[in-house]
């Protein structure tokens, strides 16, 4: 892996981590197109650039997080189910990382997005929960529980939490905001655990540190831009376009990767 690859993959991570399109699927496809093998170095690189994306959320919502203790309680409630199931099922989760799984889950998730949005349109429903302050502890727990589905590659953490948020009565924008914020404890924990499990690989590849940092920085900058634009988009439009995109990408996976 060189600096150009690091920049490209960092951009891909920043673009897709918080969109409901599966960053894992895009990273696998991008690595394939760049001719990169799934080596231990690439796995460590993915951990670092994911950290860059998380820091973008912290930076974006820092003032809100600093002032709203009640929000932290909701995030903790949402994080607990994922933490428990993720810790217990860590070894089994890694066995799901197959291109075929990613492809099928992309398509299934896309169909679900379209169905949910069309259903909401039919009954003229846009969500009763219009602000983060109105999100209840029960809603936070259910949305957090849905993150467990995102342990299956291709599902998308943001995708599963946003869909569940919509089904729980959150507006499109609030569902997206809560999904972003819930990523902070969830992704920090996942990144820390992966780093711990792969500590020896990091030590063995210290010469790649600058490449890791370049990728992480690119992911941070791009994620900041994407979060701002995405929130503006969902305040005006539905998630149907993302559902269609997922189905197209999943089909490309089935044709190209498999």
Curated annotation (Swiss-Prot):
GO terms for biological process: cell wall organization; peptidoglycan biosynthetic process; regulation of cell shape; response to antibiotic. It is found in: Cell inner membrane. It comes from the Bacteria. GO terms for cellular component: plasma membrane. Pfam families: BacA. The chain crosses the membrane at residues 1-21, 42-62, 69-89, 96-116, 135-155, 173-193, 211-231, 237-257. It catalyses: di-trans,octa-cis-undecaprenyl diphosphate + H2O = di-trans,octa-cis-undecaprenyl phosphate + phosphate + H(+). Keywords: Antibiotic resistance, Cell inner membrane, Cell membrane, Cell shape, Cell wall biogenesis/degradation, Hydrolase, Membrane, Peptidoglycan synthesis, Transmembrane, Transmembrane helix. Bacitracin is thought to be involved in the inhibition of peptidoglycan synthesis by sequestering undecaprenyl diphosphate, thereby reducing the pool of lipid carrier available. Catalyzes the dephosphorylation of undecaprenyl diphosphate (UPP). Confers resistance to bacitracin. This is Undecaprenyl-diphosphatase. It comes from Campylobacter fetus subsp. fetus (strain 82-40).
